[in-house]
Curated annotation (Swiss-Prot):
It comes from Entamoeba histolytica (strain ATCC 30459 / HM-1:IMSS / ABRM). The gene is TPI. The active site is at 102 (electrophile), 174 (proton acceptor). GO terms for biological process: gluconeogenesis; glyceraldehyde-3-phosphate biosynthetic process; glycerol catabolic process; glycolytic process. D-glyceraldehyde 3-phosphate binds at residues 11, 13, 180, 239, 241. It catalyses: D-glyceraldehyde 3-phosphate = dihydroxyacetone phosphate. Pfam families: TIM (PF00121). PROSITE patterns: TIM_1, TIM_2. This is Triosephosphate isomerase. Catalyzes the interconversion of glyceraldehyde 3-phosphate and dihydroxyacetone phosphate in the glycolytic and gluconeogenic pathways. The keyword Metal-binding does not apply. One of its GO terms (molecular function) is triose-phosphate isomerase activity. The lineage of its organism: Eukaryota, Amoebozoa, Evosea, Archamoebae, Mastigamoebida. Its EC number is 5.3.1.1. GO terms for cellular component: cytosol. The keyword Isomerase applies.
Amino acid sequence: MSARKFVVGGNWKCNGTLASIETLTKGVAASVDAELAKKVEVIVGVPFIYIPKVQQILAGEANGANILVSAENAWTKSGAYTGEVHVGMLVDCQVPYVILGHSERRQIFHESNEQVAEKVKVAIDAGLKVIACIGETEAQRIANQTEEVVAAQLKAINNAISKEAWKNIILAYEPVWAIGTGKTATPDQAQEVHQYIRKWMTENISKEVAEATRIQYGGSVNPANCNELAKKADIDGFLVGGASLDAAKFKTIINSVSEKF
């Protein structure tokens, strides 16, 4: 059994209403009792405007303390940046985590490796923990560039932060071609890339950091495939999109931690 604690994150993206978010939050909280929380860390990525509501609901739920809240993005500076949310604002609102570098931020909003790395640095310096997303597009995979792309993304982050800062990072490997498409990397494909990530970290950071850093898999994770993925040695959890909007499906994915014991 790995010493790395299994971690399952739900990324709610730009979804929900006040009513649906309340139902979902209560459902997730009910799924994670104290015993399960010892085995798996559960994080929910919440749209900015619903974060206070989710925090309020969790505070009133018996198992609410077992669920950690994450923002889905953040900006590096305060000031004249209309529409942005600064990392310090998240800290001020007692949000412990932030998801950075998600493929949708990279693809739709054209965030570069260097911009993502700067966000990671500033977030950690502010006191946040980061889920840092990396992964290749379908064209890059077909061109056999997966390792090259992932290495460049890792290098940018590593160049921006200290070795000690890695303890505040969870990596999420998300093959872009598998996100929201219904396609999923096979367990062997996912393990192969996770193993490469750990090898890169061993060679470029340290063996200790490589062994301690948790690497989630993200990309159409669902109740049907989570158990087989969880069996793989270098898969330390999941970053879940669509299935995390259904409390019952998310519960099944959280419980895939049983494959690690």
